[in-house]
Design a protein with these regions (language model features):
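Catalytic binding pocket for nucleotide-activated donors in carbohydrate/polymer assembly enzymes
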Residues: 67-69, 75-206, 210-215, 220, ...
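Long, K/E/R/D-enriched contiguous segments that form extended
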Residues: 1-63, 77, 231, 236
């Protein structure tokens, strides 16, 4: 709405794959690609925002991306992520995690300190409680002008494209409670913008992530397994 607003230039890089039968995930990828086309070709926006979707994402490609990344967005709904290792690799390379307290994000925050990450969203007990009482995404959408504007924009579409299936999913079922966490996600993004402007503070956070990433080394993992699971003696 205001391309002249004070905004630190950002490039969002999406790299992932969807299972062949996961229709909604395919629609999300389509939406990201079309948004990228729109944003990257808009002269009023493209100097401050870029969107890139990388096809055929793999370990070899990630080896080029991770050393260059400054922020690692790990935004799964609390209680749904099976603790991957990608966020650990980003941490080792100095990226600051912007994410929920889910999966290995919990261990990263414990190791480096929550003050050195950008944490947002519900905790697992809050998610479970909301499921029990009944989750209604529209209750979060109706009171949020930004969420409404974003969904309406996707529904209107552009260049003959619209994303009704995506927005209908968010308005009706929203199984990953995106709308419940959306406002706090924006708060974390605002914190990111403020912190990034302070280069010394940002460098300090980045270095603390690197310095505390040793806990995720393979040597430590193997030692723990040998001691706690296999009961194998240490051989020097």
């Amino acid at each position: 709405e205001n391309p002249n607003a004070d905004f630190i230039p950002k490039t969002y890089i999406f790299g992932a794959k969807a299972a062949p039968g996961y229709y909604m995930a395919k629609q999300m990828i389509r939406m990201i690609c079309k948004l990228g086309d729109l944003i990257n070709n808009d002269p009023a926006v493209r100097e401050k925002l870029r969107v890139v979707y990388l096809e055929e994402y793999c370990v070899s490609l990630s080896e080029h991306l991770m050393p260059a990344a400054e922020v690692s967005e790990q935004i799964s709904l609390a209680g749904t992520e099976a603790s991957g290792t990608g966020n650990m690799k980003f941490m080792l390379n100095g990226a600051i995690t912007l994410g929920t307290l889910d999966g290995a994000n919990v261990e990263i925050a414990d190791a480096a300190g929550k003050e050195n990450e950008l944490i947002f969203g519900m905790l697992t007990p809050e998610v479970n409680n909301l499921k029990q009482v009944g989750y209604h995404p529209n209750a979060f959408i109706m009171g949020d002008d930004v969420a409404n504007a974003a969904l309406n924009f996707l529904e209107r579409g552009w260049n003959g494209e619209n994303f009704h299936e995506v927005t209908e999913n968010l308005r009706s079922s929203d199984p990953y409670m995106v709308m419940a966490d959306f406002k706090d996600y924006r708060r974390a993004q605002a914190d990111l913008q403020r912190l990034y402007a302070d280069r010394e503070a940002w460098a300090r956070m980045s270095l603390k992530n690197i310095a505390n990433s040793g806990i995720f080394s393979a040597d430590r993992s193997v030692l723990d397994y040998a001691r706690d699971i296999w009961n194998a003696p240490v051989v020097k």
